[in-house]
Amino acid sequence: MLKKQIGDYVEYLLAESTAEAPLWNKEIAGKGKQNKWNYIDGCMIMAVLSMYKNTGKKLYFDAAKNFIDYFVKEDGSIFTYDPKEYNLDNINEARNLFFLYDETGEEKYRKALDLVRSQLDTQPRIKEGNFWHKDIYENQVWLDGLFMAQPFYMTYETKFNKMEGCGDSIKQFKNVVKRMRDEKTGLYYHGYDESRKMYWADPETGKSPNFWLRAMGWFALALVDTCEATSEMLYAEKRFLSDTFRDLVDALIKYQDESGMFWQVVDQGGREGNYLETSGTALIATAILKAVRLDYIPESYAQYGEKAFNGIIDKYFSVSENGEINLGGICLVAGLGGKQHRDGSFEYYISEPVVENESKGVAPFIMAYLEVAAREDINRVPGKE
């Protein structure tokens, strides 16, 4: 039953979407904005291609390819993408080009990969070597950026660049552990300002003040996806990534709600205004189950990923009498600084809109489902009849 429901859900979203106006991108849907090359669509297309790999259904491949082809031109240029914008978020969607290039052999995808990779050659960096999250966020590292850039970076270097930049990628993870991990809890702060000048940054440590769930979900899956992309020849580097991930999971599960889900502000479960959030929970579920499948962490950890996925099913996944499917509990956006006074406080994180059927929740939910399905009878998810 769940298999059919999720298939129907994905196909509905695809049928109601175009590259110009994807239904799953609530930041532009219905607002009259032109769609651009972005990480939100990148995540959804990644999930759609995962559905194709799992089912072999050509509808998924064709939909993903058509979407990407709206942006990627024959000469390898990408409509609306400018490397000199120096926005790490814009790297993420290019991860889909590796698979499309492998499947089709079309040179435009390789040229587009080279174009996106060129951004990293001149992306501004903090003194310790990490990429700035965006050119507009000087001297700042956000956990989000690890997911947006590092799996792409490691994959490109391994496939096309004789592993030249692999050590650089690993060093950036090591700096995050050094600068953004909280020694007391083992959790990671959302952002780090090397200059200590931002109003949200601790003047001593440069860290932002709270543990935002989706940022930790991005980081968790960044560790697993980058580890997967790292050559077996780099044993110590792969071991560092898997050990770091296991340490993170050990910290997170202490804060897992009895429902299986995680809280928007991770360590403050039950505090008034806090809520169980879908996107971060789904990212963590995906990361845990994928890491178990790839033997990065022991089988005993799978229970936490399955419990997280089932928690989402129980609380936020619904099917109406007329068959309409909804996935709720998704934080639309959250960040630090910028034009809005985003100060990283508890009050800030719980103030952002909560929406339904948005890619930042839908995409990792689909990927978590596929990881569960890979473990179990695909027609039945543990705990659900």
Describe every region a protein language model picked out:
Residues 55, 104, 156-167, 226-239, ...:
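Inter-helical turn/loop segments and adjacent helix faces that build the functional surface
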Residues 3-24, 62-79, 111-130, 163-192, ...:
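Long, well-ordered core segments of solenoidal/helical folds
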Residues 72-79, 125-135, 195-209, 263-273, ...:
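Acidic/His metal-coordination segments adjacent to aromatic residues that form catalytic metal sites
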Residues 144-159:
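Acidic/serine-rich, low-complexity amphipathic helices located in mid- to C-terminal regulatory regions
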Residues 2-40, 59-61, 70, 74-88, ...:
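CBM-like carbohydrate-recognition segments
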Residues 220-269:
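Oxyanion-binding "anion nests"
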